[in-house]
């Protein structure tokens, strides 16, 4: 599993399925969403840290970017003590993108038209980053705006998190190696997308 992750096999699988979905017109880039979920780690290991929401117990956090339909476009692993806002740039910058035109040259699509996020991303740095890249900003404002008002779009990423946690090895982390947990996360994203691809006529 780790060797294939180092060789990029799981990333390539995920990208191949996303390309097929993109070419079929299934991916919806009009509104994307980002969020994260924390899980406990049974052992000390790479990309773990004390969770501020779980009495300081050691854990990891999965950061996910999904399209309007909740299909995972990209995902990263960090320690549970990593603030969501710190991962926004890396999540978007390292997204390999999707080739939506089969057999035609051109850059893969990486950026949504608009991005939805909760108050954990309400920082000038995050808003500036999105504005500079021409991405519409829909981030709940701390102390002003109720995050539930954005729920009609953001609920899809919550559902995506629930899908990911149906994979037992992601719901509770056992592996010490960052490479191993990243492999499982990439494979889970690929399988979620493959389920959608299998329903195409």
Could you tell me what each predicted segment is?
Residues 1-201:
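Short alpha-helical elements
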């Amino acid at each position: 599993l780790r060797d294939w992750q180092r060789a990029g096999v799981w990333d390539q699988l995920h990208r191949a399925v996303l390309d097929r979905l993109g070419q079929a017109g299934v991916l919806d880039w009009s509104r994307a969403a980002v969020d994260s979920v924390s899980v406990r780690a049974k052992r000390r290991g790479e990309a773990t840290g004390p969770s501020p929401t779980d009495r300081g117990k050691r854990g990891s956090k999965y950061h996910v970017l999904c399209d309007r339909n909740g299909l995972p476009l990209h995902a990263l692993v960090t320690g549970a003590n990593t603030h969501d806002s710190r991962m926004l740039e890396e999540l978007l910058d390292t997204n390999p993108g999707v080739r939506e035109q089969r057999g035609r040259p051109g850059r893969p699509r990486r950026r949504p038209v608009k991005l939805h996020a909760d108050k954990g991303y309400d920082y000038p740095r995050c808003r500036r980053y999105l504005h500079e890249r021409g991405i519409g900003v829909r981030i709940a404002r701390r102390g002003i705006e109720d995050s539930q008002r954005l729920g009609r779009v953001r609920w899809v990423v919550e559902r995506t998190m629930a899908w990911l946690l149906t994979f037992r090895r992601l719901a509770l982390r056992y592996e010490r190696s960052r490479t191993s947990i990243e492999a499982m996360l990439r494979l889970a994203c690929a399988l979620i997308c493959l389920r959608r691809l299998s329903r195409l006529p």
